[in-house]
Amino acid sequence: MQRRTFVALAAASTAAPAILMTGAALAQDDTDHDSTDRRGREASGGLDAALRRFLALPGTKSYLIHVGQGGALRRFAHQPDLFLFTASAYKTFVLGQYLRDVEAGLLSKDEQLAIDDGVRTLGSPVFMNLAGTTQARSVLEAMITHSDNTATDIATGKVGADRVRALIAQAGLRSIRIPDTTRLFLSYIFGAPAGVDLGWPGVENPPGPPRPPLNDAITLAGSARDFVSWYEQALARAFFAKPETLREFKRIQAMSEQIAKAVPSDTPAYAKGGELPWPGLSTKSFAGQIVVGGDGRTPVTFCASSSIGSPRAMIR
């Protein structure tokens, strides 16, 4: 596939989830209006068109959209249990556990955390060329806003990957797989033995040959159903004892740069996406929740993923 073609398809697959969820919400709003209402007809038609555009993309697609908590008002789905590579979408779980530890008094958002070659890795637009310390709050913001992998590994190292997995298990998310660190994941798909961290700058000069990102050793993956379940639970404060913890979770999730690319302006949104172009596989995912309706109280929780190539998708 030519690069220009792939870029166009990638942009479409990023925007599609937001088109789907917004259309779903507008179509639901129409159920309270006369069937001849022009806006309602356009919303329903727009949703159908958005669904068709998303499903017409090359490769494997999966989505789940709940209008209302638990899909109480409407539900839209296409292979929601498909196990797909979801890239950086998993970073929401790291944020959740970190804020739980702050809430419990185990960590502080004001703590100074080290940025150096011991944690540095690729895919770090914020911390790639920086050294020194910065407060934990800035690390969490970099992890979600710009999907900075160095920030993610710093945050994961503070809370412990196994404790993030324990939160995932508590939420009942059986399909979700996360790495101990993004650098360990990159080391493996760059050709290092399982469990071997190439370090920095070892990941800049990997041994090869490359491995598929979706594999049975170390990966970043899950189903649309589980991501929707997570956001519905987390944003209903299922995992946070204090209202201020939920406010901070929402504040940071609302900073994700993917939101501005995909969600209509002035729409409250809390989300995280992920993408990875890789030999033989290019993927995009986007998951979270927007709030719509005249009263601004109707949650639309969503996850959409697409994989172009050989995703080794499985039902789990």
Question: What name fits each language-model region?
Answer:
Residues 17, 106, 163, 238-239:
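A short hydrophobic/aromatic micro-motif that marks alpha-helical segments and, especially, helix-coil
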Residues 25-26, 96:
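Short amphipathic alpha-helical segments
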Residues 153-235:
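Mid-domain, small-residue-enriched loop/turn segments at the edges of structured enzyme/sensor domains
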